Amino acid sequence: MNATGITDAVRADFDACLADADEGGALELAVGLVTSGGVSAEDVLLGLVAPAQVRVGERWESGEWTVAREHAATHVSRLTVDAVASAARTPVEAGPPRQVLVACSDGEWHVLPSHILAEVLRLRGFQVRSLGGSISPPELLSDVHQTGPDVVALSCTLTFNLPLAHRQIETCRCAGVPVMAGGPGFGPEGVWAYALGADLYAADARAAAGALLHRWPPVLCGESSVQAGAVEEYAALVRRRPELLAHLAYALRDVFPGLRPRSDGSDNSDGSGNSATSATSATSATSAASAASAASAREHEEGTDFLGRLLDSLAAAVFVDDARVFTGQLAFAAAYFAARSVEPRCLLAMTDALADQLRGSPRTRDTLSAGRRWLAAPETED
């Protein structure tokens, strides 16, 4: 047990509820801690729900859970956050309102961290408006003008969304509204948040609430360090993305069978030039062909999405001029592949294939070289 009163047994029970998508059990356990267990709602959100959701992601990454099971567990976590927040009594604060607009970066669909942040801020007496996932700069600007928040809290989980987050930060700053950034996508200790011009950074919801209470009202003090040359190379990578994706798919077609050229044609003959005589056989063949086609299409989509994320991480690393964005994605990819019995060394083939196509882009070339060194390091150590 720790200072919050949440025991290991309670954590195990909550994990089991998520694993079984047991909405009733999860809500009863979490809300009970608040209403009769003497645990604060904030501690339940940050000491029980948030760590459990991290473990959910780890189980998907390791291949233990399917995407569907991960989504079902996340749904239960979202319901739990709402129920715990509703069960808690929000303090009534005297004085002028403190308005916070909470949003996810453009392209970011990991909404639960921002959801938890919004509820923790409400519990601390802030007035919160939450916009949910993937808010474009124009949409964000429109809401800022309509609601007039004192600060925008921007959540980013995936590093390849950093260039899009930069546009949102710049949009808010042009409107005269400071930005607090949070989430693992902004790097260790918020290094990339500050590089993008954020005014504040918080590692978690408790730190965010504390920072805002300590420095209220927040002020514009951030400054972007993104360089013009990096923006130019990033834009070139974005323009060439379809071409580079096709090149990667060809180079890695033996690793991702679903990326191999597919034919939608079918041959229902019996091999002698005559059509199959059995209607049942024809139906079975059609069903089998449809199933195979669907599986192939799914493999193709998953493989293309995966390669696309690697490309986007390369582009984001170039944008912020920090190879750790790319090597971090390579680390995830290597673990993802290893858990699924795919040879992680195929990532070396990917970096080489990209390097062949991007010789004239110095920042991109340096980032790929850093990625290759990272991939080769375990072999060197052996």
Name each region found by the language model.
Residues 116-129:
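Short helix-loop-beta junction
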Residues 365-382:
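Short terminal or interdomain "cap/linker" segment that borders an active site or interface and mediates
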Residues 130, 134-192:
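Cofactor-cradling patches in redox/metallo enzymes
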Residues 1-87, 247-267, 279, 291-361:
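Long amphipathic alpha-helical segments
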Residues 98-100:
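Conserved hydrophobic helix-helix packing surfaces used for dimerization/oligomerization
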Residues 220-263:
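Amphipathic alpha-helical blocks and their helix-capping loop/short-beta junctions
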Residues 267-288:
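Intrinsically disordered, low-complexity tandem-repeat regions
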